[in-house]
Amino acid sequence: MLYLLTAFSDGGDIFNLFRYLTFRAGAAFFTALIFGFLFGRPLIDFLRRKQGKGQPIRDDGPTTHFAKAGTPTMGGLLILSALVVSTLLWARLDNPYVWIVLLVTVAFGLIGFADDYAKVKKQNTKGVPGRVRFLIGLLIAALAAIAAAWSHPPDLTLQLAMPFFKDALINLGWFFVPFAMVVIVGAANAVNLTDGLDGLAIMPVMIAGTTLGVIAYVVGNFNLTDYLGVHFVPGTGELLIFSSALVGGGLGFLWYNAPPAAVFMGDTGSLALSGALGAIAVCTKHEIVLAIVGGLFVTEALSVIIQVLYFKRTGRRVFLMAPIHHHFEKKGWAEPQIVIRFWIISLILALIGLSTLKLR
């Protein structure tokens, strides 16, 4: 929105700064961060008053989790609000990719909010039926995939870009739409499964968001894409604003979510942020790279799938408990140990994902 002030610039005043993407990205980061610091405590106090007993704790979970009873959930509202406000302030609102990612984020956030609300109201761990959440998520993802395909340049429409290969594209035809739907919905559910320990999900989300923001900036810059041999998607550089706001809002939330957490992000946050990551990957044509950068989320999701399928087939379990972070808890790892080690893994995977820009 503030980009419109460049119309009043004579080229030598402060309004001219708004032309620069990097300046607006930095401003978006600090806007979201300050928003989180300012409104975090009032929101937590409000949620605690309204929710009473807070987020229900699984009876079959690690016994250490019972100490977290009474902690309010829906803290994702803080991240989501900071992200939306900051993006609307600093991004160019005539950019279709900004709106695609922003609307996907808000839509998945609303699904998560409904789920969190149902859990708190019923005081059990079952909120909105999984099938309902899944079908609504598919509808949102389908609309986003079609909008992204419509916005992409003609030579990239319905194409799948392959990392590590220069200018390698696979024409998926209209199969691109269901593929993109799987990317967005899959990302949403994978991050949701990861959000089981204090600070576990938010830092990997911020790391992935930073990585995808850099990729969006590169992919949207003709000179950089020409140098690196990466496909050029005009306009995606503006998603750096969104990614910067995501990281700023995430840090503001982590201030209150650091162990022992004063608030949980809940599905409100995990579904919103993960939907955003999937949407950015689809817009920038880096869907496969998302699987690398978000490898931790993929591992968490696979651990659940393997556990369920193996148990149905044999009546036995592969892991002591799924998702896999609970397996390590059952083995006696301390919660901070699991969280920090998973953060390190996320950082390594992010660096591998970034390397795909050059290794071609």
Swiss-Prot record:
Keyword line: Cell cycle, Cell division, Cell inner membrane, Cell membrane, Cell shape, Cell wall biogenesis/degradation, Magnesium, Membrane, Metal-binding, Peptidoglycan synthesis, Transferase, Transmembrane, Transmembrane helix
Single GO term (MF): metal ion binding
Annotated membrane topology: Multi-pass membrane protein
GO cellular component: plasma membrane
EC class name: transferase
Coiled coil segments of this chain: none
CDD domains: GT_MraY
Subcellular location: Cell inner membrane
GO biological process, one term: cell division
Positions of transmembrane segments: 27-47, 71-91, 93-113, 134-154, 168-188, 199-219, 239-259, 262-282, 288-308, 337-357
Pfam families found in the cross-reference section: Glycos_transf_4 (PF00953), MraY_sig1 (PF10555)
InterPro entries assigned: Glycosyl_transferase_4, PNAcMuramoyl-5peptid_Trfase, PNAcMuramoyl-5peptid_Trfase_CS
PROSITE patterns linked to this entry: MRAY_1, MRAY_2
Pathway: Cell wall biogenesis; peptidoglycan biosynthesis
Record-listed E.C. numbers: 2.7.8.13
Catalytic activity of the protein: UDP-N-acetyl-alpha-D-muramoyl-L-alanyl-gamma-D-glutamyl-meso-2,6-diaminopimeloyl-D-alanyl-D-alanine + di-trans,octa-cis-undecaprenyl phosphate = di-trans,octa-cis-undecaprenyl diphospho-N-acetyl-alpha-D-muramoyl-L-alanyl-D-glutamyl-meso-2,6-diaminopimeloyl-D-alanyl-D-alanine + UMP
Cofactor(s) this protein cannot do without: Mg(2+)
The keyword Signal is annotated on this UniProt entry: no
Major site of localization recorded for this protein: membrane
Known function: Catalyzes the initial step of the lipid cycle reactions in the biosynthesis of the cell wall peptidoglycan: transfers peptidoglycan precursor phospho-MurNAc-pentapeptide from UDP-MurNAc-pentapeptide onto the lipid carrier undecaprenyl phosphate, yielding undecaprenyl-pyrophosphoryl-MurNAc-pentapeptide, known as lipid I.
Family: Belongs to the glycosyltransferase 4 family. MraY subfamily.
Protein name: Phospho-N-acetylmuramoyl-pentapeptide-transferase
